[in-house]
């Protein structure tokens, strides 16, 4: 029974990765903590993705700004290395703000 649960969570992780890859190709996004905060303060961010190993203080600050700007927050299941790989980058990505999803339906998830 536990294997079914892990398969389901792995599948949802795969779908978020696929949607994220499509957003990277066709949408607009901002990588990094400082740039994400600027995007949140200007009200342009629609979705924030936070890596699982992001420090708690930084995570709570991002959630607070997202609440003020009415942006959705998604806590990515993997680490910042996994999030960077899912974005198609060769570096770590701790925080990511999506301003325009493009052809992807990641904002509906």
From Swiss-Prot:
Q: Name one Pfam family in it.
A: Ribosomal_L7Ae
Q: Where found?
A: Cytoplasm
The record's GO molecular-function terms, alphabetically, read: pre-mRNA intronic binding; RNA binding; structural constituent of ribosome
Annotated InterPro entries: Ribosomal_eL30-like, Ribosomal_eL30-like_sf, Ribosomal_eL30_CS, Ribosomal_eL8/eL30/eS12/Gad45
Q: The organism sits in which domain of life?
A: Eukaryota
Query: Nucleotidyltransferase among the record's keywords?
Result: no
Per UniProt, the keywords (alphabetical) are: Cytoplasm, Ribonucleoprotein, Ribosomal protein
**Does the keyword section mention Ribonucleoprotein?**
yes
The record makes one more remark, namely:
There are 2 genes for eL30 in S.pombe.
Q: Which PANTHER family does the entry mention? A: RIBOSOMAL PROTEIN L30 (PTHR11449)
Stated family: Belongs to the eukaryotic ribosomal protein eL30 family.
Write out the function statement from the record.
Component of the ribosome, a large ribonucleoprotein complex responsible for the synthesis of proteins in the cell. The small ribosomal subunit (SSU) binds messenger RNAs (mRNAs) and translates the encoded message by selecting cognate aminoacyl-transfer RNA (tRNA) molecules. The large subunit (LSU) contains the ribosomal catalytic site termed the peptidyl transferase center (PTC), which catalyzes the formation of peptide bonds, thereby polymerizing the amino acids delivered by tRNAs into a polypeptide chain.
Q: What is this protein called?
A: Large ribosomal subunit protein eL30A
């Amino acid at each position: 029974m536990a294997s079914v649960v892990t398969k389901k969570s792995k599948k949802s992780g795969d779908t978020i990765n696929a949607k994220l890859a499509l957003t990277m190709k066709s949408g607009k996004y901002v990588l990094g903590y400082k740039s994400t905060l600027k995007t949140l303060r200007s009200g342009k961010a629609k979705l924030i993705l936070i890596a699982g190993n992001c420090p708690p203080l930084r995570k709570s600050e991002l959630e607070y700004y997202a609440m003020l700007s009415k942006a959705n927050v998604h806590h990515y299941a993997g680490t910042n290395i996994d999030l960077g790989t899912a974005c198609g980058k060769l570096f770590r990505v701790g925080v990511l703000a999506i301003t325009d999803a493009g052809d992807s339906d990641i904002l509906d998830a």
